[in-house]
From Swiss-Prot:
Belongs to the GAR1 family. GO terms for molecular function: box H/ACA snoRNA binding; RNA binding; telomerase RNA binding. There is a cross-link at residue 136 (Glycyl lysine isopeptide (Lys-Gly) (interchain with G-Cter in SUMO2)). Interaction with SMN1 requires at least one of the RGG-box regions. GO terms for biological process: snoRNA guided rRNA pseudouridine synthesis; telomere maintenance via telomerase. The lineage of its organism: Eukaryota, Metazoa, Chordata, Craniata, Vertebrata. Residues 1-59, 170-226 have a biased composition (Gly residues). Keywords: Isopeptide bond, Nucleus, Repeat, Ribonucleoprotein, Ribosome biogenesis, RNA-binding, rRNA processing, Ubl conjugation. Part of the H/ACA small nucleolar ribonucleoprotein (H/ACA snoRNP) complex, which contains NHP2/NOLA2, GAR1/NOLA1, NOP10/NOLA3, and DKC1/NOLA4, which is presumed to be the catalytic subunit. The complex contains a stable core formed by binding of one or two NOP10-DKC1 heterodimers to NHP2; GAR1 subsequently binds to this core via DKC1. The complex binds a box H/ACA small nucleolar RNA (snoRNA), which may target the specific site of modification within the RNA substrate. The complex also interacts with TERC, which contains a 3'-terminal domain related to the box H/ACA snoRNAs. This is H/ACA ribonucleoprotein complex subunit 1. Residues 171-226 are annotated as: RGG-box 2.
Length: 226
């Protein structure tokens, strides 16, 4: 589920079905580069309706800290640390997708950090959390639960292909704030370091395969070099 910035107007429609990035092949890694259509149901192929390169206006601006929300809902469970970040399995209702840079909380609404990367398969994905300065990755327990403001979630259908014959504005770009810069690429692994079907994440920092959203400004997944 490697989202690259660039372009206007939402999410790229390459060949293949249901992928989230540009790469080719049908194994379920998030890797940049490559040619051809991605395999169905992963977060990297240039699939129709995936989280491709398209950024676009009107969605995912950089969050500003505004204190805890009125209520929080379950976002995911702690899997393992990765450098100074943590990797979590997403367990949201109906597989909703968190905005990039959305604040992540404990059940008591204490903020621990922000969503940094999202990766894995379409209906079985993971996310990493960039921890706040006062938080340590080693302080969390396996399967510890984390929470999010329900208004910082998007329906998975936003990123799926539109049924044949359905009319309406293109899916993807959407309105509303949220998001911000994307992740960095670089070997997160879904539920375990490295590759594998659980959502391996390939590509160096900022390379082919990282969420490359722009830093603030203009909304959308911004292009390279921002």
């Amino acid at each position: 589920m490697s989202f690259r910035g660039g372009g206007r107007g939402g999410f790229n429609r390459g060949g293949g079905g249901g992928g989230f990035n540009r790469g080719g092949g049908s194994n379920n890694h998030f890797r940049g580069g490559g040619g051809g259509g991605g395999g169905g149901g992963n977060f990297r192929g240039g699939g129709r309706g995936g989280f491709g390169r398209g950024g676009g206006r009107g969605g995912f601006n950089k969050f500003q800290d505004q204190g805890p929300p009125e209520r929080v809902v379950l976002l995911g469970e702690f899997m393992h640390p990765c450098e100074d970040d943590i990797v979590c399995k997403c367990t949201t209702e109906e597989n909703k997708v968190p905005y990039f840079n959305a604040p992540v909380y404990l059940e008591n609404k204490e903020q621990i950090g922000k969503v940094d990367e999202i990766f894995g398969q379409l209906r079985d994905f993971y996310f990493s959390v960039k921890l706040s300065e006062n938080m340590k990755a080693s302080s969390f327990k396996k399967l510890q639960k984390f929470y999010i403001d329900p208004y910082k979630l998007l329906p998975l259908q936003r990123f799926l292909p539109r049924p044949p014959g359905e009319k309406g504005p293109p899916r993807g770009g959407g309105g509303g704030g949220g998001g911000g810069r994307g992740g960095r690429g670089g070997g997160r692994g879904g539920g375990g370091r490295g590759g594998g079907r659980g959502g391996g994440f390939r590509g160096g920092r900022g390379g082919g395969g990282g969420f490359r959203g722009g830093r603030g400004g203009g909304g959308g997944f911004r292009g390279r070099g921002h």
